[in-house]
Amino acid sequence: MSLRGLRRWWRSLASVSPYDEPELVSLDIETTSLDPKSAEILSIAAVPVRGRQVVLSERFERIVRAGAAEVDPEAVKFHRLLPSDIEHGLPPQQAVTEFVAWLGERPLLGYCIGFDCMMLERAAQWAGGGLLDGRRFDIREIYRRRMLQRNPDDHPSQVLDDILTALDVPPVGRHTAVGDATAVGLAFLALKYARPRRVAS
């Protein structure tokens, strides 16, 4: 393990709860499909979650140039990325490199965060992984644990729309990368503070 990896591992032991983090970065990516073997990234978005706010003014947002994979025409209705947008996007490796530089040492938050990180590492073509080996938290698990604390017999849904509805979080641009990243950030704040959330412009 590299020295950098060792430092990240040590910090992960020191802070095992997302509620202890002074700042998280809520990440979401849009892809050509959900098949990890063939999918390609179309867009990357991330927003800082700091204090009681999702800080949209400091967001990271990039459109990525897809390669050979075809974009599902039906999916365009949701992620709203036209072929012309994707054609003029950044090369995947450049987009991911810029994201990693922007992210720094901050821990990640997301929905199915493991899939997103795997896709980013593959797009960067960095053998052996480790590109995003810092702390990461999945809103599904955070939500599940909180619901089971309230009712051990509960069987909380793991569907994002259900989580948002249960937490009274309005869907903001669902199925766009920045919209979903924002929604997950607001869901986390709802779980942490159990009071109204707001987006900082």
Give residue ranges: language-model regions.
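Conserved protein kinase catalytic core
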Residues: 34-36, 144, 186
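Short, glycine/acidic-enriched loop or turn micro-motifs at the edges of active sites
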Residues: 29-33, 141, 183
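Acidic, divalent-metal-coordinating active-site segment for phosphoryl/phosphodiester hydrolysis
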Residues: 176-187
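Conserved non-catalytic scaffold segment of RNase H-like nuclease domains
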Residues: 4-121, 125-126, 133, 157-175
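Acidic two-metal-ion nuclease catalytic site recognized across multiple nuclease folds
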Residues: 1-16, 165-166, 185-201
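Short alpha-helix plus adjacent loop in nuclease-associated cores
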Residues: 137-154
